[in-house]
Amino acid sequence: MEDTMFLEKIAQTVADETSKIIGYQVSIADEKGYLIGVNDPARFGLFDKLSLEVIKQKKMLHWTPRDVVDLPGIFPGSSAPIIVNNKAIGAIGVIGKAEE
């Protein structure tokens, strides 16, 4: 099974279970930056250009309220790439104050 297909199959479960453990909302984006695992169903399928930036740069980034002011449905927090076989296949984000 292709890595990206695998991510699509587990994204929602990973987002839900991780959120329960850490106490913060979690989102997972596919390799094109679309949310495929989210705690708020209204956000499913949203394009998250910040996650796409994380995927392109292959590094963890942090977003402040100022960074997301013009991005409806996107929230401040931290996001890291999901890398398999040296390829960024998506990103996982944790919603909250970047300083936390």
Where do the model's predicted regions map?
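Alpha-helical/coil-rich non-catalytic "connector" segments in signaling and regulatory proteins
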Residues: 1-100
